[in-house]
């Protein structure tokens, strides 16, 4: 598959855009380097690049494009918003409608505030938790990405009872020392950390189903124990549902799993392909936020009509009958086909799946936490990624990212993808 124009444009981008990309996750550094594919059009489950090549898309913009690209209902909502003005700086009727839709779907979010991204939503949840508890420290789980704010770009220290270390240049150790990182799905390590730091902890930050080192579901009882131990210490549970909300059911992963947090952060899917974030939770906690309380949060673009109306339209599509049943059916079909192809060609993989989201790890060890995910063979993944790209299947260029099925994918797309996987595995 020729991509000469992509290579030319990447050279031009390098001259004006830092690193040639506007997010490092779009770089091909982790999959052998070279020019990333430059896309110029998307429709339904498909991309077309600047060289005219078509791809089946499982990237879904890292999750938000759950209804497929340019879904007519979502597109019409965006066009109507553009016609009537995209930004007012005032309240609008649509933000009330949308907030009510979210609260009906995720009842733990008794009061809601919109902002501009998942990063902002998580960052503000932490601020609100600190304001409510009067404490400072945060506990998070290793490998879980919660945005690029200083508060959460922190890696584990030498053990679960030690303070964190910065996971990026430019983050002071003084900030990292307020964050404790423990392994996901390890309740003993979490209990150990809480026994040492619980009285100083404002909140525990949780992806209820991990979506940032593939797809990893919680072990039975893990989330319930996290809630119990956290609340016994007087701290709050914050769910980062930026990836998971409306991905697995019409609501949050918390609905699917039957465990409620105190605060929830949202993003990605709820914007219908436009920038958005939201956070919410128990009324008495949320009332810490201005103008009702002392915790400040604001945003010029927050609640803008374009993003809000796109989000309303997206949820209206997802609320239609059988949408999530079809995600399950197609997700299972795809996963089974990948496993069959791996067995056929003697390729060692682990495959994790929840509904229409899955992850393929080139390792012989089951992946229940970040340590196991790190052991997946990145060189083999890089070869697989390039082979799939040449087959016309677009995946995220990282061994840690998930595949996402959308409402636009068809049985024919799944069959095409399985055949492509079979050919790719034959060449590994």
UniProtKB/Swiss-Prot annotation:
Gene Ontology biological process terms, A to Z: protoporphyrinogen IX biosynthetic process
UniProt keywords, alphabetically: Cytoplasm, Isomerase, Porphyrin biosynthesis, Pyridoxal phosphate
InterPro entries according to UniProt: 4pyrrol_synth_GluAld_NH2Trfase (IPR004639), Aminotrans_3 (IPR005814), PyrdxlP-dep_Trfase (IPR015424), PyrdxlP-dep_Trfase_major (IPR015421), PyrdxlP-dep_Trfase_small (IPR015422)
PTM annotation (N6-(pyridoxal phosphate)lysine): residues: 268
CDD domains: OAT_like
Record EC number: 5.4.3.8
Pfam families: Aminotran_3
Reactions catalysed according to its record: (S)-4-amino-5-oxopentanoate = 5-aminolevulinate
Gene3D superfamilies from the UniProt entry: Aspartate Aminotransferase, domain 1, Type I PLP-dependent aspartate aminotransferase-like (Major domain)
Cofactors demanded by this protein: pyridoxal 5'-phosphate
Subcellular location: Cytoplasm
GO-annotated cellular components: cytoplasm
GO MF annotation list: glutamate-1-semialdehyde 2,1-aminomutase activity; pyridoxal phosphate binding; transaminase activity
Highest taxon in the source lineage: Bacteria
Pathway participation: Porphyrin-containing compound metabolism; protoporphyrin-IX biosynthesis; 5-aminolevulinate from L-glutamyl-tRNA(Glu): step 2/2
Main location as per UniProt: cytoplasm
Quaternary organization: Homodimer.
PANTHER family: GLUTAMATE-1-SEMIALDEHYDE 2,1-AMINOMUTASE, GLUTAMATE-1-SEMIALDEHYDE 2,1-AMINOMUTASE 2
Family: Belongs to the class-III pyridoxal-phosphate-dependent aminotransferase family. HemL subfamily.
Protein's name according to its UniProt entry: Glutamate-1-semialdehyde 2,1-aminomutase 1
Originating organism: Brevibacillus brevis (strain 47 / JCM 6285 / NBRC 100599)
Name of encoding gene: hemL1
